[in-house]
Amino acid sequence: MTVYFIGAGPGAADLITVRGQRLLQRCPVCLYAGSIMPDDLLAQCPPGATIVDTGPLTLEQIVRKLADADADGRDVARLHSGDPSLYSALAEQCRELDALGIGYEIVPGVPAFAAAAAALKRELTVPGVAQTVTLTRVATLSTPIPPGEDLAALARSRATLVLHLAAAQIDAIVPRLLDGGYRPETPVAVVAFASWPQQRTLRGTLADIAARMHDAKITRTAVIVVGDVLTAEGFTDSYLYSVARHGRYAQ
C-alpha cells in the first residue's frame, strides 16, 4: 500500500501531470482539499472509489483515514492543489506517516505561480532585469512568518516577488514592500483563480494595486506578482540562443 501525494495543479483539470492522472485513475481511495479541487478532476477517480473531502478534517483525522487504508491494503491518492512542495501541509502528513511506517510517494504538480505567469504571458526571470524569484506569503494567526522573512526584508533585493494566500491583506502588503525598497511605480500583476474558467487578471503598480483589487473585489485565491519583469521590453537576449554561443559550438 502506498499514499501518493499528488500535485493536482492550479485548477484546470488537464494541468495535472500524466503520472498524477494515472495514479488518480487507479487508486481506490482519494483524499482531497474540497473548495479548491475541480469536480472534473475528481470524476477521474475509479468507479466505487472512496472519495473524502479533507477540508473539515483535522490532521489526526486525515492520518487515521490514511492508516485505515493502509490496514486494508488500499492505495491512496492524496490530492493537493498546485505542487505539494508549496503551502500544502505536506510536511506534517509525511512526518506522521513516517512514524507509522506507512509508505508514500510525492508526485509534483504545476504550481499556481507558474499558471499565473502563463496567464500573464510573462517570464519571471528576464536577463538583465531579474534572475531571482522569491515565493512567499504573509503572516496569519495560524502561520507566523519566521524572523528575517518579513516582506520589507525580502523586498530589498528587488527581485521578482510572488505572493500566495495574500490577496485579502493587500493594504498591509504594499507599505511593507515600499519600505523594503520597491518603488511606487514597480509593476504588479494579480491573477485570481489561475487556469480556472473564472480566471481574472489585473495589472497596476504598487501605487495603485490595492485600490484596483478593491474595485475588482479580488480577495482570495489569487497570486500577486511584483517586479520589473512584468513590463520589461528592452532587455538583453538570453545567451542560451545567442549567435556567440552557437558559433562556439559550431567551431
UniProtKB/Swiss-Prot annotation:
Catalytic activity of the protein: precorrin-4 + S-adenosyl-L-methionine = precorrin-5 + S-adenosyl-L-homocysteine
Tagged with keyword Transmembrane helix: no
SUPFAM superfamilies: Tetrapyrrole methylase
Pathway(s) of this molecule: Cofactor biosynthesis; adenosylcobalamin biosynthesis; cob(II)yrinate a,c-diamide from precorrin-2 (aerobic route): step 4/10
Keywords: Cobalamin biosynthesis, Methyltransferase, S-adenosyl-L-methionine, Transferase
A GO term for molecular function: precorrin-4 C11-methyltransferase activity
Enzyme Commission number: 2.1.1.133
GO biological process: cobalamin biosynthetic process; methylation
The keyword Methyltransferase belongs to this UniProt entry's keyword annotation: yes
Cited InterPro entries: 4pyrrol_Mease, 4pyrrol_Methylase_sf, 4pyrrole_Mease_sub1, 4pyrrole_Mease_sub2, Cbl_synth_CobM/CibF, Siro_Cobalamin_biosynth, Uropor_MeTrfase_CS
Similarity section: Belongs to the precorrin methyltransferase family.
Name of the featured protein: Precorrin-4 C(11)-methyltransferase
Organism expressing this protein natively: Mycobacterium tuberculosis (strain CDC 1551 / Oshkosh)
